[in-house]
Swiss-Prot record:
It comes from Latilactobacillus sakei subsp. sakei (strain 23K) (Lactobacillus sakei subsp. sakei). InterPro entries: FBPtase_class3, Metallo-depent_PP-like. GO terms for biological process: gluconeogenesis. It is an enzyme of class 3 (hydrolase). Keywords: Carbohydrate metabolism, Hydrolase, Manganese. The keyword Oxidoreductase does not apply. Its cofactor is Mn(2+). GO terms for molecular function: fructose 1,6-bisphosphate 1-phosphatase activity. This is Fructose-1,6-bisphosphatase class 3. Belongs to the FBPase class 3 family. It catalyses: beta-D-fructose 1,6-bisphosphate + H2O = beta-D-fructose 6-phosphate + phosphate. The keyword Aminoacyl-tRNA synthetase does not apply. Pathway: Carbohydrate biosynthesis; gluconeogenesis. It holds the Pfam family FBPase_2.
């Protein structure tokens, strides 16, 4: 009897010849060089910087141009050509302004040849079929003729000349250059890995997700800020309030109102009625944007206060609902002496400043007012019903996970909670223990469950999304406490301290990293762990533990540039090994195009193989080998005709 898999293959390859042809094709693919992977993290909504790295293949495209044209072009010419491939539409517009018609036509002829040569060069790892799928449908025939034809053949010389001349004559030269540039961009990196935090304070995480949907192969490892958005769309009131408060703090409420069409009118009105100007809640302004007016600052301050107080009230409710979270030390509103304006914390008394507790009942601090309850309910309904947001987050759920194992690399955003000796810490829920890999698997399942049932709002799965944001054993948070309350109200800086999990000090140790690799059934000798989440401070090394631990926070968030001294890191992994790419802060798209200002500054080889890796040694290769085995089985039962 033929099983379902064999039936599907039999329908696809109905004869022995069809099966034989596919086996030959797949065995040949196994011997192609391993395609290039690129890793980036912590995009934080900074779309222009993200898109620049996508267009440049995280620096891989410029490296290909250098390899191909060094000695043929000057460095200045290579830079100009690179930016034409990065930003073809914009750079073509500048060429039209700078050149006469005859000069432009001559430039087209030179550029066609260079474009086709580069396309050939970046296509060498792929089958013709895969390259064809990356091409614009309107130009497949012409591009393949120019790529695979023998241009040196005297008999065909006039044939190729006529193709290029007619392209120019019919006004299709720009369209061909744009289409070829996009094909090159798609081929220069085969697989993109995004290690968390697409969302946060930046203005356009929505555009980042839209761009990700257009990439041929991408996976996402969720970050702590992504979880807030999953939580809000899954019915978590606390995730919603944290998300909105952070948007207000960084003057980014436009993403809520303008991008996702969620009205904040009632919230703004309520905040204006009950809260006054408060210096602790003034928004953080982006120096690249115009200054806010006094009225704008006041409004945002009021909104942020309203959201913070509702958040602190609900924290009491959820922490009491789940004593197994072991978060009683965060029952902060219930530890306030409202008459004396004192916080009782860790056996100490701390004076409070800039308080805004007028809607807090000292006898029942977790109680929401009727108006607060209504505002939260309305906002939560808007978030869970927003189709555009649901579409974006569904893509991240479908293409994402808490961690990914790919080609002997373990990818996750934050940490694995451990004690000072490196032993996994255990989270106990409903008499079940979760630690190490099991902890990540458990959270992965809970996220999907909550997201798929957004109307179930006061259950464990939904509350665990908030725990992932701030809980002491959250692998995405990685600290003992999130001191938001203290930073708003306690002048004493000792209350602001957030102690990192021991993972972050132990990850420098090779034995510890090899222990983690073994936990995930990876080779302790050849595997790597790739993290995001923590910006690499100036003077610190992102490569640790005998080159097996790599931190690649992309540094997209402008707020961290003063800490890191650079823009951040991305990682390239090709058939020759791994390269860590350092990049400088991205200014603006307009500046990059006008001044041909790239952000890639240095490359550092991390791991170089003695023999070039092949597809057969990759995850894709393993899947192909399985398919070959199935096809060989099918070959024994398939008819000749």
């Amino acid at each position: 009897m033929i099983n379902n898999k064999m039936k599907t293959l039999s329908d696809k390859y109905p004869t022995k010849m069809a099966v034989t042809s596919e086996i030959i094709n797949l065995k040949a693919i196994l011997n192609l060089p391993k395609p290039t992977e690129a890793f980036m993290s912590d995009l934080h909504g900074e779309y222009d910087a993200f898109q620049h790295l996508i267009r440049t293949g995280a620096g891989n495209l410029r490296q290909k141009i250098n390899e191909l044209f060094s000695g043929e072009m000057t460095p200045e010419t290579m830079q100009a050509f690179a930016f034409l491939v990065y930003y073809p539409t914009e750079r073509l517009a500048l060429k039209h302004k700078a050149l006469s018609e005859n000069e432009l036509n001559q430039w087209y002829l030179t550029t066609f040849k260079r474009m086709i040569d580069l396309l050939k060069f970046v296509s060498t790892k792929y089958t013709r079929s895969k390259v064809r799928k990356a091409m614009a449908p309107d130009f497949v025939y012409i591009t393949e003729e120019l790529m695979y034809g023998d241009v040196a053949n005297v008999d065909k010389k006039r044939y190729f000349q006529e193709i290029t001349a007619t392209i120019i004559e019919l006004g299709q030269a720009d369209a061909l250059i744009i289409a070829t540039s996009h094909t090159i961009q798609r081929l220069v990196v085969d697989q993109w890995h995004i290690i968390g935090d697409i969302y946060d304070r930046g203005p356009h995480p929505d555009l980042i997700v839209d761009q990700l949907t257009q990439l041929p192969a991408v996976d996402v490892q969720w970050g702590n800020h992504d979880i807030l958005w999953f939580g809000a769309a899954s019915g978590s009131e606390l995730c919603l309030l944290n998300l909105l408060r952070i948007c207000a703090r960084y003057n980014n409420l436009a993403i809520i109102e303008e991008t996702y069409g969620i009205a904040l009118t009632d919230l703004v009105r309520f905040a204006a009625q009950h809260y006054q100007a408060n210096s602790a809640f003034m928004p953080v302004e982006d120096p690249n944007q115009g200054p806010l007016t006094h009225a704008e600052k006041l409004k945002i301050s009021q909104v942020q206060q309203a959201l913070a107080i509702m958040q602190f009230k609900l924290e009491l409710t959820v922490i009491k609902r789940h004593p197994e979270f072991n978060m009683d030390h965060r029952l902060l509103l219930s530890q306030v002496d409202f008459k004396r304006r004192i916080l009782h914390l860790n056996g100490q008394e701390y004076p409070l400043k800039n308080t805004c507790f007028q809607l807090v009942d000292p006898e029942n601090p977790e109680a929401l007012t009727a108006e607060e309850s209504q505002i939260i309910a309305d906002l939560l309904a808007a978030f869970t019903r927003c189709q555009k947001l649901r579409k974006h987050l569904t893509f991240l759920i479908d293409h994402g996970s808490m961690y990914r194992i790919y080609n002997q690399n373990l990818l996750f955003h934050g940490c694995l909670p451990v004690d000072a000796q490196g032993h996994f810490l255990t989270l106990t829920l409903a008499n079940q223990n979760y630690a190490g890999k099991q902890l990540l698997d458990f959270f992965d399942q809970q996220i999907r469950s909550s997201f798929n049932h957004p109307l179930h709002q006061a259950n464990l799965s939904t509350d665990l999304l908030w725990y992932l944001w701030t809980g002491p054993l959250s692998p995405l948070f990685g600290k003992n406490a999130m001191t938001t309350f203290e930073r708003y109200f306690c002048p004493d800086p000792e209350t602001h301290v957030e102690t990192k999990n021991a993972y972050y000090s132990l990850r420098h140790d090779a034995d510890f990293i090899q222990q983690l690799l073994s936990e995930f059934n990876l080779s302790p000798e050849t595997g790597h762990i790739l993290n995001g989440h923590t910006p690499v401070k100036k003077g610190h090394d992102p490569i640790m533990a005998n080159r097996q631990m790599i931190v690649i926070d992309g540094g997209f968030s402008k707020a961290y540039h003063h800490t890191t001294g650079i823009g951040g890191f991305t990682l390239l992994y090709n058939s020759y090994g791994m390269q860590l790419v350092t990049h400088q802060p991205f200014t603006t798209k307009a500046d990059a195009i006008a001044n041909m200002k790239d952000i890639i500054s240095t490359r550092r080889v991390i791991d170089q193989v003695s023999q070039r890796q092949r597809v057969s040694q990759t995850n894709i290769g393993a899947a192909i080998k399985t398919e070959i085995e199935q096809l060989q089985t099918l070959l024994t039962i398939q008819p000749d005709h």
